[in-house]
A protein has these predicted regions:
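Alpha/beta-hydrolase-fold enzymes
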Residues: 14, 18-19, 32-147, 157, ...
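Catalytic nucleophile loop
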Residues: 1-4, 20-36, 178
């Protein structure tokens, strides 16, 4: 929290001279944005970081309630999470290629099987597909952040519970966001 979203707010202020920002959060970035807004809403008046630092927030494909995570839920259980946390502990992060593989499996008809059939079996040239470029532009996920995200949000669905998650020692509540 302090080294990610809040440090970004400081960097924006330093670069632009503006104290407040408009934020867009996409996918996990949206979940982190919502968490940050709840953290800011919990800060007392006069704190270094307060809710007035963010003027507006726009969310794209963002989950805050993980009770029905869709296809991704197939990949999140205690056993898988333990293996993933063990793997991430070795390097301190999850390689971006792992995230790409999960996205490929979620869109297997578009991202795997259509290429097997059309390119390998039928010998056709692959068509341009913008999702392939997006999926190959991956990001490493910091181990501590990603482990907390998967465990506390996906597995335990704590983000929707007031005080279910504490960031930098502060319990957060999404309902407090204005």
């Amino acid at each position: 929290m302090l080294e990610g979203p809040l440090a970004a707010l400081d960097a924006i202020r330093d670069a632009t001279g503006e104290d407040s920002v408009n934020i867009i959060g996409y996918c996990i970035g949206g979940t982190l944005t919502a968490s940050t807004l709840a953290y800011l809403a919990a800060q007392p008046e006069g704190a270094k970081y307060t809710a007035d630092r963010v003027v507006s927030a726009t969310f794209f494909t963002t989950m805050t309630d993980f009770s029905e995570p869709g296809e991704l839920g197939v990949f999140i259980d205690e056993e898988q999470l333990n293996l993933l946390e063990e793997h991430m502990a070795e390097k301190g992060y999850l390689e971006g290629s792992y995230m790409s593989q999960v996205f490929n499996m979620m869109r297997d008809n578009d991202l795997i099987w259509s290429f097997v059939v059309n390119n390998y079996l039928l010998g056709r040239e692959p068509m341009a597909f913008d999702l392939l470029y997006w999926n190959s532009d991956n990001t490493r996920m910091p181990a501590m952040m990603h482990g907390m995200y998967l465990r506390k949000m996906y597995l335990e669905n704590r983000l929707v519970k007031p005080g279910g998650i504490a960031l930098a020692g502060t319990p957060i509540d999404l309902k407090k966001i204005k």
